[in-house]
Amino acid sequence: MAATQDYKPGDIPLEEQDDRRLFCKYHYKGVLIVVIPILLGPMFLGHPIMIYRFMYISLCLLLYYILNLMARGAVAFIYITFIPVLGIAGSKHVSISYYTDLIFLVYGSVMLGIMMDSSRLSERLAMRVIAFVGSSLKLLQIFLAISVIIMTALINPTIAAAIWMKVAQAVITEYDNAGVVKMNSEEKRYEVGSKPYPTRPVIGIYITCCYSATLAGCLSPFVNPNGVISSSFEGDLPIGKLLMIMAGPAILGIVVMIFWIQVLFLGLFGGSVKRDLAELDGNQNNFKATIAERKLALGPWTIYPILALILIIIACFLAATRKPIIYMGWDDLDNSIESGLSVPSIGMAILFFAIPANYYFCKYYVCRQPVKEGTANSLVSWKAVNNNTPWGEIFMLGAGFAAAFCSQASGLNAYVADSMKEHTGEGSGTFKFISGALYGTLLTMLSPATAVCRLSLPTLMKGGSTFSLPLATALHNQFLLPISTPSNTIIAGWGNIRPFQFMLAGSVIAIFMLIAIAGMTAIISFS
């Protein structure tokens, strides 16, 4: 943090270099920022005009984001400026689309995770995890996958990913301190003073948390987008039938995910990662002693982590019982007003700031001086929240919601639905089915599935069930970018994982899920 606070632009100049051939090494980002909009310029000649304008600005935003050409927080607001300028939608509606109910769920989940760190609850839970898995990264990955899957299926994927990501970070920190895993790479950072990039094994552990949450969400009758998809089809796709479609792909997807991440990030079949981990094997002998010392340093549980754990349990209970689809929840008591997940998550976050972390002040009320004097700080401070919230990634998630809104406002969804409706003749059913599966995967790559279901699915359903049903089930395929789902956003922000790394990790899983979901949809729905 000191490096971030002390650094000013110009303090650390670029390395001097006389070799003109290295121009691209130092300036390619600036060149691409200018070249990409120029190369995509011919799209303005396309028709319908508004659709091609939306596609143009979306491609520019996506390429800037994936190629890391500028700060993510700046890229996120491209829609706010250019969507009104291009005449697609007014600035008021675009701005509102950035701040949805799910964004505040993310804020609440982030504050919950930061409270875990402030109270050192994450460290205490990490010790319990280490006692079970030891120093094995592969066992840690499987343990985290199972834990996230259970919590997601019963509560919520975003909350589950946030909680277990903090535990995973605490475990990795202990591994790093013990010398059995190297946490941070030596790769040059995008900005001077910014967080270091994680090593490949660490990326694999972190990504396991969000991918497990996404896959478990496919199987749960308690969480969206399952509920929104089922209600959109008005009885033609009951929640039980939807879960039957998703059960096989999700279970097999978990196996594929664990295997692929172990191959790519944990050195299952050798490579540089396995060699790097082998070099640290010599520190295994001191691992148990180091962990034992850390347990002694933590000491017994105090009121601070106990309070944090109690509030987390209450938050999970409120989220799980809000609107669980298969039985009446507390939000169903008043059908005139919907209380989204932002209500319990932000409501509990307010308590994080209101409830004191210690009770020294109580003794003053009975005229007794406490043994250890001090102020009554809250469970989490705003400074900690401000410093540890991944603002740029959350703003990019807002851009994902805006993309779903703008695809509707530009007429893209209506155009696609009309095209599918008009496509008749021999083989049209197969074409529509494949197109629906591919288009659904594309939409959920750019926007969270729940937003697509609420904003785009009603229009796309006009293209017929042969198109809309595979599209709807394909919306569970949320692996390719941090903005694909809120759990991806949180893990990418806290773990400092870049978009291209998500695309690399999610490519095989996304292809498998595309084929598996489409296959099960065809077998169960059209047989």
Residue ranges and their predicted role:
Residues 2-17, 22, 28-34, 38-42, ...:
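Juxtamembrane and boundary regions of transmembrane helices in multi-pass small-molecule transporters
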Residues 15-20, 73-196, 376-379, 386-464:
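Membrane-embedded alpha-helical segments and adjacent helix-loop junctions characteristic
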Residues 19-27, 45-53, 64-65, 69, ...:
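Interfacial loop-to-helix junctions that mark the boundaries of transmembrane helices
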Residues 26-39, 50-88, 101-111, 163, ...:
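Hydrophobic mid-bilayer segments of alpha-helices in multi-pass membrane transport proteins
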Residues 31-32, 55, 77, 103, ...:
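Hydrophobic alpha-helical transmembrane segments
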Residues 41-49, 87-92, 318-329, 358, ...:
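Transmembrane helix-loop junctions in multi-pass membrane proteins
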Residues 52-56, 77-78, 91-96, 101, ...:
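Interhelical loop segments of eukaryotic multi-pass membrane proteins
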Residues 62-71, 147-157, 211-221, 353, ...:
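Transmembrane alpha-helix interface/packing and boundary motifs in multi-pass membrane proteins
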